[in-house]
């Protein structure tokens, strides 16, 4: 099925197993989050186990799916995988997992196969094999597959409008289009920006969008980032930036952009086991810069990124409320997350 079919299905019922794949990684990620939340809402006691390609263990996954929920907690297993070059995975593993779900239980399975642009032939072979196992499963329409394509501009804008409506965000179609264009038509970045704009709790203006999306990635900001990772006095560098006329909001935006890029590197490395800067950034930076991105990305674990992004969220909210020089409050906490 395609995205429209998946949306319709999820309004009617929940599957036991779902396979998400295709050419657009953002939708794979989005529907993993969405379906996981639906499972959690339907069964608040369900426990989620997340596996990347790097920590994939067939026996552990099968055990989680085979356990009888009558005598223990139910499991939601989420596989975020890219097997273009992953030797531990065998397509027949999927058959084992689906058979485990044939037993009466509340266990559930979500598989997200992220697009392997470096090996499209292998990706197609793997995704086709998984689809066949799902189609042959006795679970029938409780085991579903959804393929995602790169959306056209109008489809992306419609998706963003639906998100804005969900957030009760007062933003015109013209400004929504402006946000999308400012973000180089990156649906994932634009989607996240809507959440940030929602904290304003007021009609959105072009100035709000420009302030949110401006790039503060200059050399002085790089000094601050370097200070955070090298355990130098980040507060002294921050104080210097303020005295040089840099706005607190600009510093925050620059840090958000940098750590977002780091997280993309982190997720890509965890998923593929490879460091491909062009895949992540859309261009190939000098080797030294790419290696520095990869090194810094692995300094944090997923929980660390969540804590950093939560700090950025609080910083942004308090900045919107008129508080000044919030870096003095938050930079030390970020540095401790990087250097525990």
UniProtKB/Swiss-Prot annotation:
GO BP, sorted A to Z: DNA-templated DNA replication
Nucleotidyltransferase as UniProt keyword: yes
CC terms in the record's Gene Ontology section: DNA polymerase III complex
Keywords for the protein's UniProt record, in alphabetical order: DNA replication, DNA-directed DNA polymerase, Nucleotidyltransferase, Transferase
Molecular functions per Gene Ontology: DNA binding; DNA-directed DNA polymerase activity
Keyword match Transferase: yes
Domain of life of the organism encoding this protein: Bacteria
PANTHER family reported in the protein's UniProt record: DNA POLYMERASE III SUBUNIT DELTA (PTHR34388:SF1)
Quaternary state and interactors: Seems to interact with H.pylori HolB.
Function: Could be the functional equivalent of DNA polymerase III delta subunit (HolA).
Matches recorded under NCBIfam families: holA, PRK08487.1-2
Record protein name field: Protein HP_1247
Species of provenance: Helicobacter pylori (strain ATCC 700392 / 26695) (Campylobacter pylori)
């Amino acid at each position: 099925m395609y995205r429209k079919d998946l949306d319709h299905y999820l309004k009617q019922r929940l599957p036991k197993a779902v396979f998400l794949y295709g050419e657009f990684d953002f939708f794979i990620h989005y529907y993993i989050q969405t379906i996981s939340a639906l499972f959690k809402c339907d069964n608040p006691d369900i426990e989620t186990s997340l596996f990347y390609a790097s920590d994939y263990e067939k026996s552990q996954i099968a055990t989680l799916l085979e356990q009888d929920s009558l005598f223990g907690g139910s499991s939601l297993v989420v596989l975020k995988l890219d097997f273009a070059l992953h030797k531990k995975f065998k397509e027949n593993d999927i058959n084992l997992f689906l058979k485990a779900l044939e037993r009466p239980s509340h266990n559930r399975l979500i598989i997200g196969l992220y697009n392997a642009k470096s090996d499209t032939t292998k990706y197609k072979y793997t995704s086709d094999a998984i689809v066949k196992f799902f189609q042959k499963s006795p679970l029938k329409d409780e085991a579903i597959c959804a393929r995602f394509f790169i959306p056209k501009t109008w489809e992306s804008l419609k998706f963003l409008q639906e998100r804005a409506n969900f957030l009760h965000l007062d933003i015109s179609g013209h400004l929504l289009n402006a946000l999308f264009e400012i973000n180089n038509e990156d649906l994932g970045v634009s989607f996240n920006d809507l959440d940030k704009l929602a904290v304003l709790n007021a009609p959105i203006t072009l100035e709000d969008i420009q302030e949110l999306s401006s790039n503060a990635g200059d050399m002085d900001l790089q000094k601050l980032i370097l200070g955070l990772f090298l355990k130098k006095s980040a507060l002294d560098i921050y104080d210097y930036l303020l005295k040089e006329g840099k706005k607190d909001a600009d510093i925050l935006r620059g840090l958000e952009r940098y750590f977002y890029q780091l997280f993309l590197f982190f997720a890509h490395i965890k998923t593929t086991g490879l460091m491909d800067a062009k895949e992540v950034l859309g261009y190939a930076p000098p080797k030294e810069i790419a290696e520095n991105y990869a090194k810094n990305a692995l300094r944090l674990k997923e929980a660390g990124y969540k804590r950093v992004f939560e700090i950025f969220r609080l910083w942004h909210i308090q900045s919107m409320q008129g508080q000044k020089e919030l870096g003095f409050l938050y930079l030390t906490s970020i540095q401790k997350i990087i250097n525990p």
